[in-house]
């Protein structure tokens, strides 16, 4: 069960950019860090 849940929760996190899980403020700061 541990591996099953790990695959369910980890797969979307690894496949999708972490920026999608940030709030708007964090997202802006994250993009600024990438652009600068």
Curated annotation (Swiss-Prot):
Domain named Peptidase M12B: residues: 1-36
UniProt-listed Enzyme Commission number(s): 3.4.24.-
Any GO CC annotation of this UniProt entry: extracellular region
GO terms for MF: metal ion binding; metallopeptidase activity; toxin activity
Regulation acting on activity, per entry: Inhibited by EDTA, but not inhibited by iodoacetamide, PMSF and pepstatin A.
Swiss-Prot/TrEMBL cofactor(s): Zn(2+)
GO biological process, one term: venom-mediated fibrinogenolysis in another organism
Localization per Swiss-Prot or TrEMBL: Secreted
Post-translational changes noted in the entry: The N-terminus is blocked. Glycosylated.
Record note on cofactor: Binds 1 zinc ion per subunit.
Main subcellular location: secreted
Summary of the tissues where the protein is detected: Expressed by the venom gland.
Family: Belongs to the venom metalloproteinase (M12B) family. P-III subfamily. P-IIIa sub-subfamily.
General function of this protein: Snake venom zinc metalloprotease that exhibits strong hemorrhagic activity. It also degrades alpha-chain of fibrinogen (FGA), but not the beta- and the gamma-chains. Possesses potent azocaseinolytic activity and cleaves insulin B-chain, hydrolyzing it at positions Ala(14)-Leu(15), followed by Tyr(16)-Leu(17) and His(10)-Leu(11). In vivo, subcutaneous injection into mice induces strong hemorrhage.
Quaternary structure note: Monomer.
Protein name: Zinc metalloproteinase-disintegrin-like VaH1
Organism: Vipera ammodytes ammodytes (Western sand viper)
